[in-house]
A protein has these predicted regions:
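Short, amphipathic alpha-helical interaction segments positioned at domain boundaries
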Residues: 70-102
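Short amphipathic alpha-helical interaction segments
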Residues: 2, 35-52
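Short acidic, hydrophobic short linear motifs in intrinsically disordered regions
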Residues: 19-34
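Basic, amphipathic "hinge/linker" alpha-helix immediately C-terminal to the N-terminal HTH DNA-binding motif
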Residues: 64-70
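Short, flexible, solvent-exposed loop/turn segments with mixed acidic/basic and small polar residues
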Residues: 53-57
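Short alpha-helical segments that sit at the start of domains
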Residues: 1-21
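Short, Lys/Arg-rich nucleic-acid/phosphate-binding segment
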Residues: 58-64
């Protein structure tokens, strides 16, 4: 499994398991993400790569959380890079008002 696939798996965890206002620690996120056990080093690299995305707020050792003001960038990333379809995006990310700005 490559790093990009793991980044997408981690994004799925953040979208489905977020706790408003609280960052999710790396060990919790990686424990919920789907990847083969032998890819632990790649998963840690993927988590570090995700920290630098514009739709993620990095809280250092406390973990990461989604940036509510950057849902457009998150949705575009999930659609373009992770293969999420429009239906799932609209189902999972309900409080976004810029759907007409997404490049489908």
């Amino acid at each position: 499994m490559d790093e990009q696939a793991i980044v997408c798996s981690i994004c799925r965890v953040l979208v489905t398991s977020h706790d408003y206002g609280k960052p999710l620690p790396q060990d919790v996120v990686l424990g919920k993400a789907s990847f083969p056990a032998h890819n632990g080093a790649t998963a840690k690299a993927a988590f570090d790569a995700l920290r630098r995305k514009p739709f993620v707020v990095d809280h250092g050792k406390r973990g990461v959380q989604l940036d509510n003001s950057q849902f457009g960038a998150l949705i575009q990333f999930l659609y373009d890079e992770c293969g999420w379809d429009r239906f799932e995006l609209e189902l999972r990310i309900k409080h976004f008002e810029g759907w007409n700005e997404i490049r489908w």
